[in-house]
Amino acid sequence: MEASRVKPGFNGVGMAAGSVNGSSRRPGPGLGYGYGYYMGSGAAAGGSGRAAQAPVDGCSVALRVFVVASTLVSAVVMGVDRQTRTIQITITDALPPLEVPLTANWSYSSAFVYFVVANAMVCLFSAAALAACRSRAAMVPVMVGDLLALALLYSAVGAAAEFGILGERGNSHVRWAKVCNVYGRFCDRAMAAVIVSLIGAFANLVLLMLNILTIHKSSSYY
């Protein structure tokens, strides 16, 4: 009778061994104790590390580099733009014309100063965003910054272009004479800087649209 109580597979040694083996198999990764628990925590840590890094899109990186380069070139070209010309002023017909050196400088125009500052700020922001392109937590702040940078660039381009057109054509209503016929090189450089900055602003717009599309695709609500 005593021997029948300790049959293998029932309340005896076999059942105890089976229970031990079963307990060692049941705690899966991250669910039980011992080795399975540590493996689970390691996998979770690896998953969290991978989740903290966003996948890098080659097209977005290329656009970001182009925005950095275009805004840097625009700020530098406009920042060094100046030209000095000697203007002949006739006081009376009896006297020879008076030669006066006059200088056109970008710092004389508030629109051009705003243009240089705006492009420099966007260049610095885009460089910082390029350095943080692998951080998933920085996606939304960078997207908001891109939106502000886009508004800043377009406003600066509009202000500089309006002042450039005024120098190219003048304004007959207020009797403002055109000056680009005298300072041709100055106006050409300013217009080149405005065009490059406008192309950079368009690239920033495309980049912002790509970021919005990426967040839309990765959202769990859609």
UniProtKB/Swiss-Prot annotation:
Annotated source species: Sorghum bicolor (Sorghum)
Side Extracellular, residues: 81-110, 168-189
Family from the record: Belongs to the Casparian strip membrane proteins (CASP) family.
Subcellular location as annotated: Cell membrane
Protein name: CASP-like protein 1E1
Spans within the Cytoplasmic topological domain: 1-59, 132-146, 211-222
InterPro entries the UniProt entry points to: CASP/CASPL, CASP_dom, CASPL
A single Gene Ontology CC term: plasma membrane
Cell membrane in keyword set: yes
